[in-house]
Amino acid sequence: MASIEQALAEIKRGIDELIPEEELIAKLKENRPLRIKLGADPTAPDIHLGHTVILNKLRTFQELGHDVTFLIGDFTGMVGDPTGKNTTRPPLTREDVLANAETYKEQVFKILDPAKTKIEFNSTWLSELGAEGMIRLASNQTVARMLERDDFKKRYNGGRPIAIHEFMYPLLQGYDSVAMETDVELGGTDQKFNLLMGRELQKSHGQKPQVVLTMPLLVGLDGVKKMSKSAHNYIGVSEVPTEMFGKIMSISDDLMWNYFECLSFRPLEEIEQFKQDMANGKNPRDVKILLAKEIIARFHSEADADAAEQEFINRFQKGAMPEEMPELEFEAGIAISNLLKDAGLVNSTSDAMRMIRQGGAKIDGNKIEDTKLIPAAGTAVYQVGKRKFARITLK
């Protein structure tokens, strides 16, 4: 059993805020398993590495002997979290939410211990509130308090509409903590308002308020925005090992340390040694390979990580093409920009032309020079960037 000092050090590793720390210490001194909650609305079918930053911390609480619940917001998912949005999020159907929830359950157990994880659905208690319960819940807060939220404030000041149900979202999430009598709730920094709402509602219901622990948001592959599907800068935990490896190797050397801090389980002393080694001339690529292999081994296997490393070396350091790639057929006479888009190698024809101008598109290893090229009939390997290949036959 870890001492309180050791447990606190593990809990605080890589966090953004602990609100308030002294209350967590007091709860730890009670020498009982604490009730730890992480909630997630299943608004998309897949989990990416950005989500795993908080899941890793949840795993830490499991290893320290606490009771962990992964709460699936099947009810709140149909309301739609307005956090960070400048327009109203379209609500999902119950069918969408439940389908996504099944995928979530499969993916979270790549990190959490299934034997030590309780899965709950917040429709269990929120569906029972009814109209009277909803009105009573809404009476706990004022419109002025809700407008303290940065995203609501910006929309209000900008004359953009805010739907009434969006004001309810923080209250519903906060009520989850009341229903579960949560001791500690985890979330990203963008969830701070909602998490603190849980503290307020617990106090008003005569409960001890939960401690709020926020984790930093993982920066996406572009090095600018937070990792998200909408920004197309994410790495999915279910992606094939070679794709994951290539994406991790593509991040900047500076961003690599953010990934080590948020995603790695290595001792902090070892990560500091990596920094010192690089300062003394070690190639950043070699350190990045260690990061990529650690992450891939976690979500796939060590054998997959080794194979992905070898594939990367063959493809990018030796100039070899991958052994496997999509094989497609199209009618001859198609313009190169349309062909690359239809083959899934780029998102749009404008992306295709941009890649051609930058020298990032090739046919059988030869750079495409003409943005208006009509490729000749026959079979060839088309490449865009370093990772996207397709063997295409034009008939």
From Swiss-Prot:
Its EC number is 6.1.1.1. One of its GO terms (biological process) is tyrosyl-tRNA aminoacylation. Disulfide bonds: none annotated. Pfam families: tRNA-synt_1b. It comes from the Bacteria. Transmembrane segments: none annotated. InterPro entries: aa-tRNA-synth_I_CS, aa-tRNA-synth_Ic, Rossmann-like_a/b/a_fold, S4_RNA-bd_sf, Tyr-tRNA-ligase, Tyr-tRNA-ligase_bac-type, Tyr-tRNA-ligase_bac_2. A motif ('KMSKS' region) lies at residues 226-230. GO terms for cellular component: cytosol. Its main location: cytoplasm. A motif ('HIGH' region) lies at residues 42-51. It catalyses: tRNA(Tyr) + L-tyrosine + ATP = L-tyrosyl-tRNA(Tyr) + AMP + diphosphate + H(+). ATP binds at residue 229. It is found in: Cytoplasm. GO terms for molecular function: ATP binding; RNA binding; tyrosine-tRNA ligase activity. Belongs to the class-I aminoacyl-tRNA synthetase family. TyrS type 2 subfamily. Catalyzes the attachment of tyrosine to tRNA(Tyr) in a two-step reaction: tyrosine is first activated by ATP to form Tyr-AMP and then transferred to the acceptor end of tRNA(Tyr). This is Tyrosine--tRNA ligase. It comes from Photobacterium profundum (strain SS9).
